[in-house]
């Protein structure tokens, strides 16, 4: 009876610990990818994200990038990701993917966030984002909050 309880306790602890392990290996992969990006690469990722968003049908007409620009950006990022996954972070990729096949997707989400953060470091971008406030009726908003 005691040995059955021990086996059950071990199985439960393994089930509880497995997600933590896969999460930490996913975090390690994400951190490795981010840590191995230099400033130029971060800016290139930001440009790539911008081009990708510019493909949206509602905003495509505002996009000034040429198909050649987009292709060059795609090619650059493809080679960058290949380097990150096969050279800089290959061991972490293997560990993370083995414990959680979704780890690669999660790591790419982090890379996307880094690209967006790069865009948001620009004072011009932050000013442009805040421009809507000139047209918001803050008195009406304040009234709702009181």
Q: For the regions a protein language model found, what residue spans apply to each?
A:
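Repetitive helical segments and hydrophobic/amphipathic motifs
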Residues: 11-15
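Bacterial N-terminal signal peptides that target proteins for export
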Residues: 1-8
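N-terminal secretory signal peptides
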Residues: 22-72
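Compact alpha-helical subdomains of small soluble proteins
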Residues: 53, 57-63, 67-146
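Terminal, compositionally biased segments
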Residues: 7, 23, 142-146
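N-terminal signal peptide c-region/cleavage motif recognized by signal peptidases
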Residues: 17-19
């Amino acid at each position: 009876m005691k040995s059955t309880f021990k086996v059950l306790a071990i199985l439960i602890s393994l089930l509880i610990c497995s997600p933590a392990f896969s999460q930490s290996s996913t975090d390690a992969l994400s951190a490795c990818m981010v840590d191995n990006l230099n400033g130029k690469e971060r800016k290139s990722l930001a440009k790539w994200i911008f081009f990708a968003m510019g493909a949206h049908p509602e905003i495509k007409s505002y996009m000034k990038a040429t198909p050649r620009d987009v292709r060059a950006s795609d090619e650059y990022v493809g080679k960058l990701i290949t380097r990150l996954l096969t050279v800089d972070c290959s061991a972490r990729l293997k560990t993370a993917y083995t414990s959680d096949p979704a780890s690669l997707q999660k790591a790419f989400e982090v890379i996307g966030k880094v690209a967006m953060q790069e865009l948001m470091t620009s004072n011009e971008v932050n000013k442009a984002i805040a421009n809507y406030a000139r047209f918001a009726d803050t008195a009406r908003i304040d009234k709702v909050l009181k």
